[in-house]
């Protein structure tokens, strides 16, 4: 696969995730030292599902993130472009509707969802701005966007230590827990190429979201961005 900062072909990324689907959640918990579960809880708080709402969870993978949104009266749609991930998700969580979807061309109607969320998937999209525009399109007026993504640690010393872990230790450790360690080499590359917190916030605003903000998690290893689709003009 070409380096993440040069190209992100959808078919290549999908095939890579097909290969790791079976053990993906366990590997993530191990390689993040349990932080992945904490981040999912923080995303659930940001989404704050309410009865009567319909929530779209993009890049949902096996549905590990989607389960937290299952509240009485809440409809959850889990979408992903990896058939391997979707197969695992349908097997593990039959109570959730799983849909094959490309984030840059969503198979949903305009203004269909109260909340759209995507966790650790926006980096893998070929056209980030187009994907954010599609999310805006399918949101209802006043609807909420929640993006959870790897980010940049503000502290330079800690950031350098984290980069060393990503580039030198993560690939070696992943080889012990995954049959496709190249997926985690791609992870390190894509994190390194990803815009910092403020840059992503500006892009979200550029697309047309209002009241955009972000909160760092775990020293800034991850950031949760939020924004809202404008209400229709009277």
Write out the residue ranges for each language-model feature.
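N-terminal, positively charged/glycine-rich alpha-helical extensions of SAM-dependent methyltransferases
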Residues: 1-23, 177
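C-terminal alpha-helical "lid/dimerization" subdomain adjacent to the S-adenosyl-L-methionine
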Residues: 11, 148-203, 207, 213
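Conserved alpha-helix/loop element of class I SAM-dependent methyltransferases that forms part
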Residues: 33-53
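Class I SAM-dependent methyltransferase SAM/SAH-binding core
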Residues: 54-105
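A short acidic, Gly/Pro-enriched loop at the edge of an enzyme's catalytic core
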Residues: 104-116
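A short SAM/SAH-binding and catalytic strip from SAM-dependent methyltransferases
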Residues: 114-128, 151
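A short glycine-rich, Lys/Arg-flanked "PGG" loop and its adjoining helix->strand segment in the class I
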Residues: 129-141
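Core SAM-dependent methyltransferase catalytic element
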Residues: 201, 207-234
């Amino acid at each position: 696969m070409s380096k993440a900062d040069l190209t992100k072909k959808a078919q290549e990324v999908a095939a890579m995730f097909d290969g790791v689907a079976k053990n993906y959640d366990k590997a993530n918990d191990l390689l993040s030292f349990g932080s992945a579960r904490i981040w999912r809880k923080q995303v659930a708080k940001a989404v704050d599902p309410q009865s009567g709402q319909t929530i779209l969870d993009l890049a949902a993978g096996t549905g590990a993130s989607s389960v937290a949104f299952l509240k009485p009266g809440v409809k959850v749609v889990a979408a992903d472009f990896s058939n391997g991930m979707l197969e695992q998700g349908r097997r593990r969580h039959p109570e959730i509707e799983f849909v094959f979807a490309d984030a840059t061309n969503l198979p949903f109607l305009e203004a269909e969802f109260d909340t759209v969320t995507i966790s650790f998937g926006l980096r893998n999209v070929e056209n980030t701005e187009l994907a954010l525009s599609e999310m805006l399109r399918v949101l209802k007026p006043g609807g909420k966007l929640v993006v959870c993504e790897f980010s940049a640690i503000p502290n330079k010393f800690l950031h350098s230590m984290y980069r060393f872990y990503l580039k030198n230790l993560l690939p070696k450790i992943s080889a012990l827990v995954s049959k496709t360690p190249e997926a985690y080499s791609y992870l390190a590359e894509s994190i390194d190429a990803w815009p910092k917190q403020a840059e992503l916030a500006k892009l979200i605003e550029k697309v047309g979201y209002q009241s955009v903000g972000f909160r760092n998690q775990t020293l800034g290893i991850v950031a949760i961005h939020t924004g809202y689709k404008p209400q229709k003009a009277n």
